[in-house]
A protein has these predicted regions:
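A short, conserved alpha-helix in the catalytic core of glycosyltransferases
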Residues: 140, 146-147, 153-179
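Catalytic core of nucleotide-sugar-dependent glycosyltransferases
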Residues: 190-214
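Glycine-rich, basic loop-to-helix element that forms the pyrophosphate-binding segment
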Residues: 22, 66-83
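Short, acidic, metal-binding catalytic loop of nucleotide-sugar glycosyltransferases
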Residues: 24-33
């Protein structure tokens, strides 16, 4: 079955194994998106014809564009510009779709996001946080005309897009019950984490100055809590309200 409302945009660069992992998960679905658009940044290990041929039976709607870009958010904008569905689901190579998230999907929605640590173990799930302004972007089904990704933000353009797209916050969106996404938590450098947090603070002051009064201290506190401790909390206290603030 095809859900003609939904387009999937998958971003990849030099990650053939991760891309195949994502495509294999999509191929297992009973309800498929109308199109799967892979935006590749000019990988050395990707041969378009081989991938398309490999998935030609189960994913005939697969299209691949491979050319240099200005990074992940530029690639996401490229994918957005060529989608024909009314809804878009963005996935990175390595993300795994499970269940049947696209079945009867008609409007902007949230998908459950299961975190997987570096050892392949489940370590909690994402929650809408920061007053409804933050959620893993793989867990959001966007309208096709959502706010584009601002390339002036190198790390947090997805957060900026959420701020500008969902004026009432993400908590107003319905949650899909019959499927979701597994997201692998890779190692992020301290420098990148700090820079991304600075971008989030900048965006809050610019677009949500009232929220910034309350959220900037939370973001700073998160920087001070070691990642290992946050993972421990996610893994061992799933129902605890603290999860919503890390």
């Amino acid at each position: 079955m095809i859900n003609n409302n939904i387009s999937v945009v998958t971003i990849t660069l030099d990650d053939l194994q991760g891309l195949c992992k994502t495509l294999n998960s999509l191929a297992e679905l009973d309800t498929l998106p109308r199109e799967i658009i892979v935006i590749d940044g000019g990988s050395n290990d990707l041969i378009n014809g081989d991938i398309i041929e490999r998935f030609s039976t189960k994913l005939p709607q697969l299209r691949i564009t491979s050319e240099p870009d200005k990074g992940i958010y530029d690639a996401m904008n490229k994918g957005r510009s060529v989608c024909s569905g009314s809804l878009i689901h963005y996935l990175n190579s390595g993300d795994v779709v499970f269940g049947e998230p696209y079945c009867q999907l008609k409007v902007e929605s949230l998908l459950p996001v299961q975190f997987i640590d570096e050892n392949g173990n489940k370590c909690g799930s994402d929650k809408v946080k920061l007053f409804g302004t933050a959620y893993n972007h793989q867990g959001i089904i966007f309208n096709y005309d959502h706010f584009p990704y601002d390339l002036n933000y190198k790390i947090s353009a997805d957060y900026v897009s959420i701020l500008n797209t969902f004026s009432n916050g993400l908590k107003a969106l319905p949650v899909v019950k019959n499927g979701g996404v597994e997201y692998s938590l890779g190692g992020v450098s301290t420098k990148k984490t700090i820079y991304g947090s600075i971008e989030m603070i900048r965006a809050l002051i610019l677009y949500r100055p009232f929220y910034a009064i309350f959220l900037v201290p939370v973001i700073i506190l998160k920087l001070l809590v070691p990642r290992r401790l946050r993972r421990y909390i996610l893994r061992n206290f799933k129902g605890n309200i603290l999860i919503k603030n890390i």
